[in-house]
């Protein structure tokens, strides 16, 4: 069983990390080809393409210029420790033990516009390139066309030999669209997190993102082997709602009031 996560825009390359174990990213050549395209863009063009402020655009132009095909602990950091958005605050990877990180390495995949798919301990140089960016490349007009069936084929390879391959999708729609479902062999189970607000159950973006990270943390701590094992998830007030769920959609709800 594999858990899919989105990356985060917010990165942390400053906080000291304990983990010295790392692996090399798998799609370096594909990432290098994207960097080559990005290096042709000015800060103004990057700002327009990615809807960034001038300061952020200039920061990322600098990142593309500094990017190298060689990844070390001097120029990169393990992906799960570098991402720092709502999902990763829920996951709290820095507090995972070495054996828990090893389990995550085998069961968690982080989707990425630049790197395609990252394992938690894969080294990652800082970047900004969201999957929905309309970056034209020789392969097409956007990143979905660039990655094509590559990510799905990789996920198939990861689950080769498993009797009933299953993917728990905790990624956003923007990122999951990069997984070609015609190529993918595994059953996909979606996790939905809803809060009661204004008299109705709603997906509140900030809470849902954090909950995705909490779910991965729960799976790591319990070494979850099946989607059924996730039904016991109860972090921060969420409870599995069987009546709102189906075999391929697990709905968790909580009342904040």
Curated annotation (Swiss-Prot):
InterPro entries: YaaA. It comes from the Bacteria. Belongs to the UPF0246 family. GO terms for cellular component: cytosol. This is UPF0246 protein BAV2675. It comes from Bordetella avium (strain 197N). GO terms for biological process: response to hydroperoxide.
């Amino acid at each position: 069983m594999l858990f899919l996560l989105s990356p985060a825009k917010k990165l942390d390359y400053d906080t000291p990390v304990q983990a010295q174990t790392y692996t090399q990213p798998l799609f370096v050549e594909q990432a290098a080809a994207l960097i080559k395209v990005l290096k042709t863009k000015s800060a103004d063009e990057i700002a327009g393409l990615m809807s960034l402020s001038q300061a952020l655009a200039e920061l990322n132009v600098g990142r593309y210029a500094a990017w190298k095909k060689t990844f070390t602990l001097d120029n990169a950091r393990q992906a799960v420790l570098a991402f720092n958005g709502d999902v990763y605050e829920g996951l709290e990877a820095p507090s995972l033990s070495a054996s828990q990180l090893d389990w995550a390495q085998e069961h968690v995949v982080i989707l990425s516009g630049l790197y395609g798919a990252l394992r938690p301990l894969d080294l990652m140089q800082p970047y900004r390139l969201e999957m929905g960016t309309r970056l034209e490349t020789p392969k097409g007009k956007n990143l979905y066309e660039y990655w094509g069936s590559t990510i799905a084929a990789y996920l198939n390879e990861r689950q080769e030999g498993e009797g009933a391959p299953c993917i728990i999708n905790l990624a956003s729609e923007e990122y999951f669209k990069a997984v070609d479902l015609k190529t993918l062999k595994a059953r996909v189970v979606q996790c939905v997190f809803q809060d009661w607000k204004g008299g109705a159950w709603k997906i509140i973006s900030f809470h849902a993102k954090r909950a995705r990270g909490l779910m991965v943390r729960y799976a790591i701590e319990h070494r979850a082997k099946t989607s059924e094992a996730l039904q016991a998830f109860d972090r921060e007030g969420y409870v599995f709602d069987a009546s709102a769920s189906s075999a391929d959609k697990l709905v968790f709800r909580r009342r904040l009031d």
